[in-house]
Regions:
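Active-site-adjacent structural elements in enzyme catalytic cores
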Residues: 1-170
């Protein structure tokens, strides 16, 4: 139902797995994803082996959704960016733990209600934590990289203002 798409699955490695410990952070777990982007799928078919690839962002920063975001983040530290257009989702992949009873480890492009309906699990499972150090799980992961003020009545001239409220019913 969700593959290919913006979802990653945490699985237990087989004892004699050929997956590098560098990829798994010395864990016996691995996250697997089936991307939907046509360029990524073409690359995976051409190389004919699994590919380990992080998000194109510096740790603890917001994930890029366009080529320009990547260039802005890395500047001259990178030589090229594969142009595939802007992200259709704009968020990281949802990460599902499939070791034991399925549960959501990180919310992302697929909402929890849809996933929990699919795996027929209770929302209480979402609170269960798996002791895994994985990309995107840091409390700083979605930090914008600039100071933020909450519950501001009036913004300063050099600040943006985001209003969050319930939508009015039509």
């Amino acid at each position: 139902k969700f593959c290919p798409g913006p979802i990653s699955f945490v699985l237990k490695l087989k004892k004699k797995s050929r997956v590098s410990k560098i990829i798994t952070n010395n864990s016996n777990l691995v996250a697997v994803r089936f991307p939907s982007h046509h360029l990524t799928r073409k690359i995976l078919k051409e190389i004919d082996y699994p590919l380990a690839a992080p998000s194109a962002n510096i740790s603890s920063s917001i994930s890029p959704v366009s080529k320009q975001d990547v260039i802005d983040e890395f500047g001259n530290k990178i030589k090229f960016v594969l142009e595939g257009g802007s992200s259709k989702v704009g968020l990281e992949s949802t990460i599902i733990n499939l070791v034991g009873k399925p549960n959501i480890l990180r919310l992302g492009g697929i909402d929890s209600k849809t996933i929990y309906e699919f795996i027929k699990s209770s929302k209480n499972n979402q609170k269960r934590e798996l002791n895994v150090k994985m990309p995107g799980s840091s409390k700083l992961h979605y930090s914008p990289g600039i100071p933020m003020r909450l519950n501001v009545k009036k913004n300063n001239d050099d600040e943006a203002f985001i209003l969050i409220r319930k939508r009015k019913k039509k």
